[in-house]
Amino acid sequence: MTFSGTTLERNRKTALYPLDLELTERRVGLIGANGSGKSTLARLAGGLIRPSGGTVQVAGYDTAKDAKEVRRITGFVFQNPDSQIVYPVVEEDLAFGLKERGFPKAEHAERISRVMERLRISHLRGRLAHELSGGERQLVALAGVLVTEPDLLILDEPTTLLDLRHSRQISEHVAALPQTVIFVTHQLELLTEFERVIVLDQGRIIADSDPDDAIARYKKAMA
Ligand SMILES: Nc1ncnc2c1ncn2[C@@H]1O[C@H](COP(=O)(O)OP(=O)(O)OP(=O)(O)O)[C@@H](O)[C@H]1O
């Protein structure tokens, strides 16, 4: 993934100053203060928004020109699970994502079982999504993306509502995934095994390093 002179303006305010970034690692963490531009960068990477200037290339596609292709190979998990759970019953919701991405119906049940077991949420399969707790919904939203096995997984604070056990489980699960993962989080301990951690501050990259170094610099910047 390549960002070249990429910027993002919103309402004449700069959310992201020009940045050049080549991401080749399988595990990239994004950290930084509230409003520093993490979600903006993640959304640009997933082709959900277009840069105001410069380009973003994902798997050879320009996200401004081929947003559809980029979204096809990308799974995006939002901070707020309600923005991605569509169907009333959990299982139907997971099947919807599979159907939308063209997975044969015969595979649905097995794919859903596998991911739900891995996230230890099999018991939620027949439940109504709106009756679940915030954390349970977050897990279902994550499962909804994982079932489709996207090439690129972008997780924007996917563990904010989870208890310690589930956060760790997600982190272990993510560690075992073969795909490329971009992980936005304020839970710094979830990134200790990551290959690369980028620190944003007021729309600029202030550190880009290994987890220990990047986290230390982030803490210093926040002191
Ligand atoms: N839809 C929007 N319209 C206008 N401004 C926005 C919009 N989304 C984000 N912003 C602004 O862009 C800047 C960067 O926001 P962004 O969501 O990328 O930050 P973040 O680092 O993900 O923050 P947080 O840790 O709070 O989730 C902020 O100043 C924010 O107010």
Regions found by a protein language model. Give the residues of each.
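Catalytic Walker B motif of ABC-type/P-loop ATPase nucleotide-binding domains
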Residues: 153-157
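Conserved beta-strand-loop-alpha-helix hinge in the C-terminal portion
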Residues: 204-223
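Helix-to-loop junction immediately C-terminal to a conserved catalytic motif
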Residues: 46
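The feature captures the beta-strand-to-loop junction immediately N-terminal to the Walker
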Residues: 31-33
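Conserved ABC transporter NBD signature motif
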Residues: 54-65, 70
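Conserved ABC ATPase signature
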Residues: 128-132, 136
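Conserved ABC ATPase "signature" region
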Residues: 106-124
